[in-house]
């Protein structure tokens, strides 16, 4: 890794009634990750998460319903030799209609699947999914 600062992002865990986690794949990439992205000037991590979910998957999240899962650092999925630091939230289930903006594909993932798919972003696989395994599905 280079000496550059980590790329700051916010992301949201959305789970269905069975506990599956919504993942997205951005156009021109191969890795699945949580919906979310980089902040715009002056945005808080929570504001970034809400805006990105509206843009990427067409859902309006309630900022008051966001619960912080954690802040995780890992290898960036789509930028070689970079780290990403993500503030990750959990939000109650909302209807997800379709991919929008730069999202090419949506996929629901069983976080307890073994083995996990090989096309997951490092932070999702190494940090977020292990943190989720201890939470009830409805959180």
Show the residue positions of the predicted features.
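The catalytic Nudix box helix
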Residues: 34-69
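Active-site-adjacent beta-strand/loop module that shapes the phosphate/pyrophosphate-binding cleft
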Residues: 72-98
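Conserved hydrophobic "DFG−1" position in protein kinase catalytic cores
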Residues: 14-15, 23, 91, 108
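NUDIX/MutT-family hydrolases
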Residues: 88-90, 98-136
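Short loop/turn segments immediately following the C-termini of beta-strands
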Residues: 26
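Actinobacteria-biased recognition of intrinsically disordered, low-complexity terminal regions
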Residues: 1-2, 137-139
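Conserved N-terminal beta-strand and adjoining loop/helix that marks the start
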Residues: 1-21, 38
